[in-house]
């Protein structure tokens, strides 16, 4: 008989927040898309994880489960109230996953941006009571359990952002793997409105390499270690073209198409997840001001006009 507490690695006195964090961690571990070579077992485990979350996150279901086990949930036996005699119906594991992550890639930049806005607006939060035009916010890995495995430090993950009249304008994070400071990932993203157009800039610094790109509807520039990179620019344009050509909003298929790509960094031992709807790189942050940066941007823009993305 399955033990839902054991499935999520929880004690029986676990709080609702503990249950949600545990689901985040275990669901990502057993997601079928992350286990293509062991998909049958992964699907079974993924289903158990979803069921465990549905039961333990619901006070009524959890109370019945604690008293009578899965038999009580299935409507069997004679030890539970008549009002529950018909049992419960579980949702599809994928539906539970989407509901928890709000149909967003759990490792995407937008996921963290939205989560931080939720933090600011949370009832009783000291952040939510501050002036939104000038407020700064900080958080640690305890707020986002998906980063816990990256760090052996109590404050291994830290984010900082600022809120202006346009809303959330920047977000940055830093994560270390357990092998030490030599292998790390730093990601930064920013959005700003310029002449009515949204400019999205993203940057990733992984160990000793920095990649940066700017997008205002079309790829504007692509830099590697602050130097224009034609190969990277071409690959990014190619990826976007292929993604656009392969996308059809009216097409349907009975086959399962993965929404998420689980990427392993062999050198750093770090697992990362990207959305198949987003570019396969983590591009970007903007360095404020500087004649050198402006000069490079102009040079890359001239080159980009010669290409058709």
Curated annotation (Swiss-Prot):
Record bears the keyword Transmembrane helix: no
Biased composition range(s): Basic residues: 290-309
InterPro entries per the UniProt record, alphabetical: DnaJ_domain, DnaJ_domain_CS, DNJB2/6-like, J_dom_sf
Disulfide bridge map: none
Keyword Chaperone among UniProt keywords: yes
Keywords: Chaperone
One Pfam family in the UniProt entry: DnaJ
GO biological process: chaperone-mediated protein folding
Location of the J domain: 3-69
Function: Probably acts as a co-chaperone.
Protein name in UniProt: DnaJ homolog subfamily B member 7
């Amino acid at each position: 008989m399955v033990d839902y507490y054991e499935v999520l690695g929880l004690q029986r006195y676990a709080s609702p927040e503990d249950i949600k964090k545990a689901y985040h961690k275990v669901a990502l571990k057993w997601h079928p898309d992350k286990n293509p070579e062991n998909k049958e077992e992964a699907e079974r485990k993924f289903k158990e994880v979803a069921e465990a979350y549905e039961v333990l996150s619901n006070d009524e279901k959890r109370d019945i489960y604690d008293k009578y086990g899965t038999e009580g949930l299935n409507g069997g036996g004679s030890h539970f109230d008549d009002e529950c005699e018909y049992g419960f119906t579980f949702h599809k594991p994928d539906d539970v996953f989407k509901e928890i992550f709000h149909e967003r890639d759990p490792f995407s930049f937008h996921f963290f941006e939205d989560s931080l806005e939720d933090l600011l607006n949370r009832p009783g939060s000291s952040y939510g009571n501050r002036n939104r035009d000038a407020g700064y916010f900080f958080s640690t890995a305890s707020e986002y359990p998906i980063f816990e495995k990256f760090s052996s430090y109590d404050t291994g993950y830290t984010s900082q952002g600022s809120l202006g009249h346009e809303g959330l304008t920047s977000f940055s994070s830093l994560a270390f793997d357990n092998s030490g400071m030599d292998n790390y990932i730093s990601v930064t993203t920013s959005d700003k409105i310029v002449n009515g157009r949204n400019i999205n800039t993203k940057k990733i610094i992984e160990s000793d390499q920095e990649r940066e790109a700017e997008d205002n509807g079309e790829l504007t520039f692509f830099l590697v270690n602050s130097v224009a990179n034609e190969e990277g620019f071409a690959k990014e344009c190619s990826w976007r073209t292929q993604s656009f050509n392969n996308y059809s909003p009216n097409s349907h298929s009975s086959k399962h198409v993965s929404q998420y790509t689980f990427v392993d960094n062999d050198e750093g031992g770090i697992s990362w997840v990207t959305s198949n709807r987003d570019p396969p790189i983590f591009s970007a942050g903007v360095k404020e001001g500087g004649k050198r940066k402006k000069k490079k941007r102009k040079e890359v823009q001239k080159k980009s006009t010669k290409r058709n993305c």
